[in-house]
């Protein structure tokens, strides 16, 4: 009994395994795990991370393409279809009563208006039209950028031209069919004032052009504005007279254009054709007008004005014109006034007169009388101020100071002598500048005489009794290059004149007159102060020596530019040091002086 351990059941070991069978293969853990994971439904869930897209993306792309093509076809049919009939049905295009068969070209895609999807869409093949249809402008560009590009294109086109004015005149004539010169008269100076101005501007922003119609109303009594082919035309009748510079600055600030894009001249006031252009143009629908017609347009368009009597010549009008333009010579007056005949009725009447030469001589004499009276009425300070106002531009006053110091002259001493010289102080009103040749004596004195509009006397005319006559018509005079015979003559006959006393001066066709010599500049190669023979002139002269040669640059231009602008800056800078009076103190209660008038007409008429 003790030998039989456990229990033995016969027959049970045949259907029940009491022990597991061991093998070497089952000892591999990886193999065991793989075997445990196997099942009949193992492919039900895929654990693969890389999935293929399939045809869904391609399908979406095809749908988007179809929608885009449909939208494009609708836009083509709406905007670039050559005939409105095709918008209804292409089948109507094939119906024709004539035998004229035109070539066809397929323009649209397969999808059409929906009448017949299988019908081929055709349109006329006009070569020029198809070329224009193919060029569809981009829709994404904004209107503002287009305006800027258009303005820049106009300006760049203008800048590429060699002659800007000729280009603008050509564009104006092409736009309006009439020359700009035929509508306007020419003003040479930019500072000449006029109430009426004709302005042509090329390449203006349209929005700014529209706003200018309202902004200009506060400046003008009458406005005439139109636009054609990028050229904008203005007729402006200002409430107050303006010069060209003022008008251009106003329009540049208002329209944001460059001065090179503007043509500005006053209109022709006596031309019937010009007046009819403005009158008929005002009835155009594209023309904007504000205010009543100016007087000169009404006069030119009235029938009574055309049938009136011929105008008679008015001498005072001619004299006033010559005085305003500072013309005193007969030849200049005759030539310049004859050029005004197409625009000025009085000039036309003068040309038709038999006594043209007599009128010219009398006009020149009257202008000289008026100019001489105007000069005598002014003091030296007023005369210098009056002449400096006529000098345009600015210069450097230091150029004159450097030149004086270059010649070794104490500037304070020279300034003191110049002050006594300009004031005509007795025995101090004659300034002598001497030195070797080519030292700049004549250049220095001539530049001063030029800016002050003085007179030059020459000893070569000393045999004549009238060689000193120009001194009676000037505020300052110059005797250039005095030699020994000249010094002897002055020592013999001109001592009283250099003293600043009254002398008797013989003038042509006149009795001798009583005058005082104006301040006299003398240049010479002889130092009269060192000559004992001229000892009586020593107390009557103030002398300065120019010992150094006048310097020149490598390009043969002067080192010191003695210009009108330099003298203008010199006098303005040293006005108080020269003891010149203030112009406000010379007026009556500070009131502005009125312009001189010598014409028998009302003040509000046009010149």
Curated annotation (Swiss-Prot):
It catalyses: Couples ATP hydrolysis with the unwinding of duplex DNA by translocating in the 3'-5' direction; ATP + H2O = ADP + phosphate + H(+). The keyword GTP-binding does not apply. Residues 582-607 are annotated as: Disordered. ATP binds at residues 435-442. A motif (Nuclear export signal) lies at residues 88-97. It comes from the Viruses. This is Replication protein E1. It comes from Human papillomavirus 24.
